[in-house]
């Protein structure tokens, strides 16, 4: 499992909430990428590569299935296209900004020195929190539509492994208080979103559609990785694109991979 930007894999505060333990209880072997919170795609891919090699050594498996959230999906794609195509069986991305963000394009119109200063300050903070090679400016840049377009040219979708993507969205500015300011901004420039990433940008390879919750909240960028450690609602879904708890979603994704022979 490969986390997104701004967080790290920690032993006592799991990025993925309840999800890993439930998957393990269902028989899955779960491991993590351990990449930096704000590392560049290239730098983080190197770290993930070391983690992947260790997983193969421990398990004796020939390949791994990658489930990646947000920017972690870009790092997983980069890894596949740079020496690890024979060690990856499938890549599943969840709310990954495959096509960048017009919102970030707008924000990056600020004076470059100002963006650089903000990035450097963020680097110092994340260095204190444990990042080995923080590079916030590279993180900002990969989210622009221009850089994302070039990234997609340089890292084409593999045609010999299973590649799929899933999307989720909020239903309004107050779907999640964490994203009450970012949701309307992204909505203005990019349309429907999860508070951070537009549903259009989430589309990649075999896109499985956009899901939301059974209530007025919808599902945010944080909800997707079970940040609150609880189900969204007890209300039973009334449509195929609705879910009431994120954990069963992951169980079904892994179950689907197993049924396909992965």
Language-model-detected regions and their locations in the chain:
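Hydrophobic/aromatic beta-strand patches that form the interior of the parallel beta-sheet core
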Residues: 31, 92, 164-166
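Serine-dependent carboxylesterase/thioesterase catalytic core
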Residues: 3, 45-148, 194
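Short aromatic-enriched loop/helix-cap "lid" or pocket-rim segments at secondary-structure transitions
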Residues: 13, 102-107, 174-179
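C-terminal catalytic-base region of ester-bond hydrolases, centering on the histidine
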Residues: 156-262
